């Protein structure tokens, strides 16, 4: 709709060299081409988390449940660049359970409380829960049924306190990078 048009126009106005969120179409295109750019903070945080915990990505089957422009789509590119075999599931995907059961890494980012159940996950999988859902009782839960799924995983992120802090950390990292680049450019201009 019209709101999407305005959103696209607004994103184009952000200088891609200062786009710390990684949403400008230039950065989105550069990410798709495997070029150096700012990456959307949540996918960037997920990759950093996997790397920090030395969770193998290369050659692994990774499934992303969700195809948003903020998480799902950029994460596809990030995982592909690390040589994962990437499958994307969404609201029209048939037999999601069959796909998730065969996945080494599962990223749940669809906005449905406790969607991913224990019977949908193979033993030893890594599960990243991006969801933030407020229940009627006020409790915040993710897209993963943590109680069930955590019994089968080798690694799982909690909600709250898992991906959210990593997103903020990557935003701060991008801000420092822009600031440093800006300062370096001005230092060289003076001489």
Q: Regions from the language model: what does each represent?
A:
Residues 1-6, 185-188:
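Short, small-residue-biased leader/transition segments that mark boundaries at the very start
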Residues 4-57:
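Anion-binding alpha/beta catalytic cores of soluble intermediary-metabolism enzymes, centered on
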Residues 9, 13, 45-52, 74, ...:
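Alpha-helical scaffold segments in soluble metabolic enzymes
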Residues 22-25, 40, 88-89, 156-159:
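General beta-strand structural signal in soluble alpha/beta enzymes
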Residues 40-115:
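Glycine-rich phosphate/diphosphate-binding loop of Rossmann-like nucleotide-binding domains
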Residues 90-177:
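Rossmann-like adenosine-cofactor binding region
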Residues 191:
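Cationic, low-complexity basic patches in intrinsically disordered or flexible, solvent-exposed regions
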């Amino acid at each position: 709709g019209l709101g999407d048009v305005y959103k696209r126009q607004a994103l184009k106005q952000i200088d891609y060299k200062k786009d710390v969120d990684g949403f400008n179409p230039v950065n989105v295109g550069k990410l798709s081409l495997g070029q150096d750019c700012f990456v959307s903070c949540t996918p960037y945080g997920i990759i950093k988390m996997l790397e920090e915990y030395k969770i193998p990505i290369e050659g692994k089957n990774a499934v992303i449940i969700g195809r948003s422009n903020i998480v799902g789509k950029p994460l596809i590119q990030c995982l592909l660049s690390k040589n994962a075999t990437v499958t994307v599931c969404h609201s029209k995907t048939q037999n999601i359970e069959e796909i998730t059961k065969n996945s080494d890494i599962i990223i749940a980012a669809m906005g449905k409380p406790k969607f991913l159940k224990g019977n949908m996950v193979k033993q030893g999988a890594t599960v990243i829960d991006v969801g933030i859902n407020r229940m009627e009782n006020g409790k915040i839960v993710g897209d993963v049924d943590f109680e069930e799924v955590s019994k089968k995983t080798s690694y799982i992120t909690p909600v709250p306190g898992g991906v959210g802090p990593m997103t903020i950390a990557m935003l701060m990292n991008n801000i420092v990078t822009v600031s440093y680049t800006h300062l370096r450019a001005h230092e060289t201009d003076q001489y």
